[in-house]
Amino acid sequence: MVDYFDYNSLLTRAREQLPEEVFKDVRFEIPSADSFVEGNRTIIKNFKDIAKFMERDPQEFAKYVMKELGTAGDMEGVRLILQGKFGWRMVNEKIQNYVNEYVLCPECGKPDTKIVKEGRIHFLKCTACGAMKPVKTL
């Protein structure tokens, strides 16, 4: 039997037919928090926009940020109001920690994930590669 195509030429041909987005690594960049201190409170003006960008529930995301900062707070429209003075850098660091723990897939690094509950355990399930990782309940 004659082999008309060798493996490398088939692989090259298949890769050429894939869209450019598949090969890009910088497709997911979180918008930085637009925060300021007003009196003894810190206000994040674009909090709901950040949660929507990550495709996460704003209430659960707010709960995580408040827990990590060790403070109380409240959602007011699209803003999150935190009790206490927190710098821009600290707020963005907590947001990035949330992204690393609850948004990005640990296997492929893509943000195409959902938090699913199976039994009593919450999992981070990747829709891109199918990987599942147990995560802490908020």
Swiss-Prot record:
Pfam families: eIF-5_eIF-2B (PF01873)
Membrane in keyword set: no
A molecular-function term among this protein's GO annotations: translation initiation factor activity
Keywords on record: Initiation factor, Protein biosynthesis
InterPro entries assigned: IF2/IF5, TIF2_bsu_arc, Transl_init_fac_IF2/IF5_dom, Transl_init_fac_IF2/IF5_N, Transl_init_fac_IF2/IF5_Zn-bd
Record has Signal as a keyword: no
Family under the similarity heading: Belongs to the eIF-2-beta/eIF-5 family.
Subunit comment: Heterotrimer composed of an alpha, a beta and a gamma chain.
Reported function: eIF-2 functions in the early steps of protein synthesis by forming a ternary complex with GTP and initiator tRNA.
Identification of the protein by name: Translation initiation factor 2 subunit beta
Encoding gene per record: eif2b
